[in-house]
């Protein structure tokens, strides 16, 4: 599976063996009012457990986790 990953910039990379799901996790930090929600993209073996005030979306096809600003 290939997923978008966050870092210095958003890139699409092949996931490590055993990590066949892509995810997008969003949450608010102290800058949420001015910058919006923090967005983390990556690969995972299982969909992470949602903690309070987080939103997590998991999917299983190549590059199915684009940053919201990348969507057409």
UniProtKB/Swiss-Prot annotation:
Pfam families on file: Toxin_cobra-type (PF21947)
Ligase in keyword set: no
GO CC, alphabetical: extracellular region
SS bond partners: 3-22, 15-43, 28-32, 47-58, 59-64
Localisation: Secreted
Keywords in alphabetical order: Acetylcholine receptor inhibiting toxin, Disulfide bond, Ion channel impairing toxin, Neurotoxin, Postsynaptic neurotoxin, Secreted, Toxin
GO molecular function, one term: acetylcholine receptor inhibitor activity
Function per UniProt: Binds with high affinity to muscular (alpha-1/CHRNA1) and neuronal (alpha-7/CHRNA7) nicotinic acetylcholine receptor (nAChR) and inhibits acetylcholine from binding to the receptor, thereby impairing neuromuscular and neuronal transmission.
Family: Belongs to the three-finger toxin family. Long-chain subfamily. Type II alpha-neurotoxin sub-subfamily.
Designated name of the protein: Long neurotoxin 4
Organism: Ophiophagus hannah
